[in-house]
Amino acid sequence: MNYWESHTQVAVRFRRFDRKRYAAFRSMHKVINIGVVTASTLLFALPDTAQAQKVIEPNRTGEEASVELEEVEVTASRAPIARNQATKIVTVIPAREIAAAPVTSIQDLLEYAAGIDVRQRGEGGTQADISIRGGTFDQIAVLLNGVNLSNPQTGHYSFDLPVNLSDIERIEVVSGPSSRIFGASAFAGAINIITKTGKENRISTDNYAGMHKLWKLEAAINHATTHFGQRLSAGYASSGGYIDNTDFKQLNLFWQSELKSEEADFQFQAGYNDKGYGANSFYSASYPNQYDKTRRFFLSAGGETHGKIKFTPKVYWTRHFDRYELFRSDPADWYTGHNYHETEVFGANLNATTQWKLGRTSMGVEFRNEGVKSNVLGKPMKEPQDVPFEKEGQYLKSDNRSNISYFLEHNVLLRRFTLSVGVLANYNSALNERIHFYPGIDASYRIGDNVRLYGSWNRALRMPTFTDLYYEGKTNKGNPDLKPEESEAFEVGLKYNTYFLRAHIAGFYRKGKNMIDWVKEKPEDIWESQNLTKVDNLGFETNLSLLPRELGNERFFIRKIELGYAFIHQDKDSEGYISDYALDYLKHKFTAQLSHSIWKGFSATWYVRWQDRAGSYTKYENLKPAYEEPYAPYCLVDMKVNWEYQRLNLYAELNNLLNSTYYDLGNIPQPGIWFKAGFRYSFKY
């Protein structure tokens, strides 16, 4: 029997009355709390309220456990709508599951979601290409506390974020085109990372070490008063690499602050991310000695007024630096120097939401400016500029574009029926064209108390990245005449939710045109960016989550069982091209999770992942292309053991327990079995 289960009084919090016959018996001999739901705004949109019953085990500070209905606010529309009425699949990964998972980065964590394709190039969060439902890594919006940090240079760097895993309160994954919610970059979906705020005076640390000279130190301090809360965190990680030239070093600094008053609430955040890593065969297997050095600075401020009409303004700024070395050492005679890139993004948005007798209406506007300076990307500059933070190098080229988006959405909420209609009106200065409209409609109908049927239709767009447009190198060539990608998507699904079981199944079809991809006709050719005629996705995904303890036996050793599966079929007209990204999609993915207690504070979490990728890659031998090799399916097993006592948590984890050989991207082997161990400690002051 778990120590905490036998010595801690269990508190049950009721936030919903379901009139079940057994409800009274489940409350016997327990402390009962009555909870009230509150809502706040994420992004410039108001979120929907997600309710999911979940057992909360003792946290690492040793405070009392509670069994309650988990209430999470997620951004699934521009106006607030309850989750049981929402018409999108939103995957929420809370802090408790993050702490229990055998991962070292956000990219690792997203591997366990069935609908997400994570293609790692290196470990420790160095670089990964992340896509949703058969899209590409450039087709998702990446947000930090509602601020869009998608990188206009390339999606390779969108996850250069200044936060540690211990900073994260939850991660929200919105599946499917969401341009009318998040703007043009949410072509295939969006990932919103929500960080913890300073709600109490606490100091915490999280540290670990492992094979391949891996180690990391994290520390955070929270401070709170009646109306003011803030959190400051820092983290540093390093590894010697699992094979030659896969070493890395990474630094994160992050500050977040909240100010609450009767009239309005305000949020501020700032961060810095610094990475340097060996990039063995990242972009071409002909050059295994590549290296990448990146920096990102980030600032934002926002607020939310109280009253009948809620205004949510936000301003933000981010600057990203990248030094890419084709030769980390011993360069070839023809090599003229490294590539230097600097992207700067700043923007402002305003959203207004009100509820009246005909429903809830939300409208807003966003301005976003994206610029690049480089010695490779863009148009020739009049005067060269020295590269900041570097001893050598000059910017010779640049480009800039502005995007203005107008949003309008209305929700009709009836007892069993929900209707949401909205439109994005988008103008981009690089297109020299009129405003383009991207509408969408979502509808759902509740069947009985626990089942909801839903359907949606949405249009979306994505602008080419600066890399798509301008990059030229030994193995790649951009195309300045690229058109924006456009798509039309349909989705139908069924959701089933009870206090112990949550399940959904969704079928989707996305019809795309002018899809951008890096392609070549023969293995010996270089990659060129082109608008493919069409790339259409047809598929479905399903998920089932079971909480056995909610059936009545709160001492049952199994805490959670979760199963997920996603299937995609891609119909493409590539005219015989070899594809680098879009055409080697993840066809099958199965995930399983088991979380259970062991004995006296010990618990374990197991993850199983099996996936089968379509397409092939060009196999290299002796640094030269040899033949096309189909991607082989593989299975991975990861596990983590935790021991908790009061404010201390000790843990050990094993990744790739079966020591499988596998590739996410061609010619870049992924790590074999990897052991790590560490501890977390926190205390109030």
Where are these regions (language model features)?
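Outer-membrane beta-barrel signature, preferentially recognizing the C-terminal barrel domain
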Residues: 283-307, 341-343, 432, 452, ...
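Extracytoplasmic beta-strand/coil segments of soluble accessory domains associated
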Residues: 107, 111-147
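Short acidic/polar hinge/loop motifs at secondary-structure boundaries
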Residues: 129, 148-175, 193-196
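Short, acidic, small-residue-rich periplasmic hinge/interaction motif at the N-terminus
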Residues: 53-99, 137, 304-306
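Gram-negative outer-membrane beta-barrel transporters
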Residues: 413, 417-419, 509-511, 531-619, ...
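Short strand-turn segments of transmembrane beta-barrel domains in outer membranes
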Residues: 190, 195-223, 233-246
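Short loop/turn motifs that connect adjacent beta-strands in outer-membrane beta-barrel proteins
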Residues: 82, 197-202, 226-228, 262-263, ...
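Flexible loop and strand-edge segments within Gram-negative outer membrane beta-barrel domains
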Residues: 54, 239-246, 250, 264-345
